Amino acid sequence: IGFINYFFPNCKIIHCYRNAEDNMVSLFKNYFPSQNMFWSSNLTNTVEYYNLYSSLIKFWNQQYKNKIYNLSYETLVSDSQNEIKKLLNYCDLEWDDNCLQHHKNFKTPIATVSLTEARRPIYKSSVNFSKNYSDHLAEFFAKLNKIT
């Protein structure tokens, strides 16, 4: 973030985050073919990596207090229109009703494990889904450094 801000001092930085437990379970249960994501196939590594990320984003938020827009995934899916309007305002962009129709506007292919989700309307079923695993993963959840 420091590098980006140095070369693009007027840039807008958006940090989208979600519930730590949901994030951890999602990372672990999805297969990522990239060698850069090898750590996500091990719960201990996933917790360590998440905690490094959490520390790093806290550092950058302290360095650039008003420069980073922190967008909660849970808030985005529960109040999409209002949250998207806030995000657009931060980016100095105008509201367009198509912002809520993203799933109908694909013109280019996307390569992500979330391909099917990206082509659906915004949905809430992934919020707090980690509770289904809490009995089995409590020791890992307890080690997560929450962002909020």
Regions found by a protein language model. Name each.
Residues I4, F8-K29:
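Conserved phosphate-donor/acceptor-positioning beta-strand/loop module used by diverse small-molecule
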